[in-house]
Amino acid sequence: MVMEKLGDSLQGALKKLIGAGRIDERTVNEVVKDIQRALLQADVNVKLVMGMSQRIKERAMKEEPPAGMNPREHVIRIVYQELMEIIGKGAEIQLKPQTIMMVGLQGSGKTTSAAKLARYFQRKGLKAGVVAADTFRPGAYHQLKTLAEKLNVGFYGEEGNPDAVEITKNGLKALEKYDIRIVDTAGRHALEADLIEEMERIHAVAKPDHKFMVLDAGIGQQASQQAHAFNDSVGITGVIITKLDGTAKGGGALSAVSETKAPIAFIGVGETPEDFEKFEADRFISRLLGMGDLKSLMEKAEESLSEEDVNVEALMQGRFTLKDMYKQLEAMNKMGPLKQIMSMLPMGMGGMKFSDEMFQATSDKMKNYKVIMDSMTEEEMTDPRVIGGSRIKRISKGSGCSSEDVRELLKYHKTMQTALKGFRGGKFNIQKMMKKKMGM
């Protein structure tokens, strides 16, 4: 999950608010203290935290809740709005031909982000390529070349040429028929005069439409100083924050964004190309506060899945064979890690907390199910009712799994089939379930 530790702490503070008997000044102060502690532990700038805390207190005690909203919901709404104020709106990313220059500290994930960014645009239907203009770090050329080939995006580089400005010039000419041209520059300390000068010369040659600064989520308070230096040099138009998955604090990077007023363009939440997301502030805050991000989940599903993957019409009519389940498991794999998918669900719709061990065990079990189904016949996959004792033994032997594992799979399939029939019959009221869980 994105900034898991901060999310857990903020959700804990909101649960205290939801569970309070009445919303008075004492309750608000306690909740604000918990929020303060969570943000400071995540390395968010003290000045930003204190300013936000004061505004939450004042608004919670003075503002009247809007019509149809109770005091608890009103305070949660205020917290949401004030967090939005710190982070700001995401950068506007237009799907049109453009040149992008990548800058940032060495080790921030800049080269990997350059390739993932190209892949992002390619998934949107634009022809994208990268220019390897990092001549400072050994291995940078080969890293970007390998990533570009793996992701099937265009690449230009000149191995052995130390002149980054010349490479940029030649690369942009070589990729002139591409819609998106991304220049990967050398990672540097923002106060190194010679490297800053090179960056400015590349900027003059490339004339980029966007200058994206890449920040490691764990950089801490020094992020602000670095961000200001880069901004003063080339004028940052957007920020990419990497390594926001897991326990990364991320507050320093978010503070830097707030201070420089450069909007966040993308966030990296994992190692695969699919773990690179266009930043949407409202969705980001919703996930932090445990409200889920169903819009991103639907977009991820649309990008990853084809009509062949899931036969929605058949499912809603209650027809759910083992073949359908097999396709469903493959489709889930395309969407990314289970933990990331679950983080997009609100608390009460499956977005409850699981340990890493539980996520791993579930993922392993899903893989095991696929192995078992690979040992079944076409008839068995279409109509599991024909699978009796002798067939279970054969499937068990063929898959290398136990008979108990095969029976467990059949039981899981039956449960899924029953659940789908329930949804078809309208037995589940999701909104009612959420209200009950959240105590609203």
Swiss-Prot record:
**Localization annotation:** Cytoplasm
Q: Could you tell me one molecular function GO term of this UniProt entry?
A: GTPase activity
Q: Which UniProt keywords apply?
A: Cytoplasm, GTP-binding, Hydrolase, Nucleotide-binding, Ribonucleoprotein, RNA-binding, Signal recognition particle
Give any single GO term for biological process: SRP-dependent cotranslational protein targeting to membrane
- Keyword presence, Nucleotide-binding: yes
Q: What EC numbers are recorded for this enzyme?
A: 3.6.5.4
The family database entries (Pfam families) matched by this protein are listed as: SRP54, SRP54_N, SRP_SPB
Entry GO terms, CC:
signal recognition particle
Top enzyme class, one word, equals hydrolase
The family note in this entry says: Belongs to the GTP-binding SRP family. SRP54 subfamily.
- Function, please? Involved in targeting and insertion of nascent membrane proteins into the cytoplasmic membrane. Binds to the hydrophobic signal sequence of the ribosome-nascent chain (RNC) as it emerges from the ribosomes. The SRP-RNC complex is then targeted to the cytoplasmic membrane where it interacts with the SRP receptor FtsY.
Q: How does it assemble?
A: Part of the signal recognition particle protein translocation system, which is composed of SRP and FtsY. Archaeal SRP consists of a 7S RNA molecule of 300 nucleotides and two protein subunits: SRP54 and SRP19.
UniProt free text on domains: Composed of three domains: the N-terminal N domain, which is responsible for interactions with the ribosome, the central G domain, which binds GTP, and the C-terminal M domain, which binds the RNA and the signal sequence of the RNC.
Q: What is this protein called?
A: Signal recognition particle 54 kDa protein
User: Which species is the source of this protein?
Assistant: Methanosarcina acetivorans (strain ATCC 35395 / DSM 2834 / JCM 12185 / C2A)
